[in-house]
A protein has these predicted regions:
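Extracellular parallel beta-helix/beta-solenoid repeat domains
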Residues: 1-373
Length: 373
């Protein structure tokens, strides 16, 4: 493989969704003690067994790194000890609304990644975004701060450990903009969207474990979400042409087979087996600059409405994510005026309601009125 060390790569032009360093997504590259800055597109692409260490990915037009490889064959990726800052200078979400194509690092169909000891800050959009059939991630000992959007999104993916990260002052820009527009969705700092633990898919864990993190003065906390209308073969599946890791042939996810197990369960990405414990959630609204629209934790789904043949219509998915998919907060510390959203999104709960029936969340957790401590 190629090693790039102690080199500055700057002011190159890559097209949208392409990158400058390792443009052809070759395997086995090592990038260390490098500065990759002020390029258009992504600063880096990625291949299998790539190591990105002690480098600065700064002020690139779209991503710091786009961890996507044609054929979805990235395995064993390491991103360690880097500064990842100021990326998406070309503001692609404004140029292509809803593209989901920006951030510090975007991971796509990566099987096995260690993301540790990075400083991910002041990116325009999401800090770290794992989207579409990623699996077996360890995201540990990072400082994620002051990103315009979520610090971390784990979406339509599987099996991750998110541990011992410091996550502060994220999502102020996007959270405030949504609130100003009257959008009440609890846009999260750690956003788990149609992603969960799956024992049938080999990994170092069979859950999504969120433990030992400090979340301080972010717009919101952790949101566990499912879009009831997003599943294989549905128009609401934005990962066009993809199905879950459990179903190889997307065409099987259709009537009548999808209405019964195993396809009823396996044709959708499920937020399940998420274990949130031993975290500190600190909120001072005077620091964040918000009132009632911030400081929320959430586990919920929308009502299923489409397509016509969907077996997930009505409140089935909301009931499942809230009560039957082993999503559990426990043993956490809260300081500040936190509130909670559960079920179908229409209910905002205080800590007593959240801990009481029927939700029974945050057993063994402590709640206090002030941030800090």
């Amino acid at each position: 493989g190629v090693t790039i060390s102690h080199l500055t790569v700057e002011r190159f032009a890559a097209p949208h969704d392409e990158g400058v360093v390792n443009h052809d997504m070759a395997d086995g590259w090592v990038i260390e003690h490098a500065t990759v800055q002020d390029n258009s597109g992504a600063g880096l692409m990625a291949g299998a067994r790539q190591r990105v260490r002690a480098s600065c990915l700064r002020n690139n037009g779209q991503y710091g790194m786009n961890a996507y490889k044609t054929g979805d064959s990235i395995r064993g990726l390491v991103v360690e000890g880097n500064e990842i800052t100021g990326n998406n200078t070309d503001d692609w979400e404004r140029r292509r609304p809803g593209c989901g194509c920006t951030g510090g690092v975007k991971f796509w169909a990566v099987d096995g990644a260690d993301v540790r000891g990075n400083w991910v800050h002041r990116n325009r959009g999401t800090g770290l975004w794992a989207d579409n059939n990623n699996n077996d991630f360890r995201i540990e000992d990072n400082l994620l701060e002051s990103n315009d959007g979520a610090a971390l999104m784990y979406e339509t993916s599987y099996n991750a450990v998110i541990r011992n990260n410091t996550i502060r002052r994220n999502n102020w820009v996007e959270g405030r903009a949504y609130a100003k527009d009257g959008d009440g969705f609890p846009y999260a700092t750690v956003y788990v969207s149609e992603a969960g633990g799956e024992p049938r898919i080999p990994a170092r864990t069979d859950r999504i474990e969120i433990e030992g993190n400090v979340l301080e003065d972010n717009w919101n906390g952790i949101t566990l979400w499912e879009n009831a209308d997003r599943f294989c073969n549905s128009p609401a599946n934005t990962s066009t042409g993809y199905c879950t890791r459990l179903v190889k042939d997307t065409g099987r996810c259709a009537r009548p087979a999808i209405a019964a197990e195993p396809l009823y369960g396996d044709c959708r990405w499920k937020t399940q087996r998420v274990d949130i414990h031993g975290n500190r959630f600190l909120l001072d609204p005077s620091v964040v600059g918000c009132a009632t629209e911030c400081g929320r934790m959430a586990v919920f789904a929308n009502e299923g409405t489409s397509p016509d043949w969907s077996p997930y219509k009505g409140g089935r998915v909301a009931e499942a994510i809230t009560h039957r998919q082993q999503n559990r907060w426990h043993g956490n510390v809260y300081r500040g005026p936190w509130s909670f959203v559960a079920g179908d999104g229409s209910r905002t709960l205080d800590s007593r309601q959240w801990q009481g029936t029927p939700y029974r969340q945050d057993a063994g957790s402590s709640f206090g009125p002030r941030a800090g401590g």
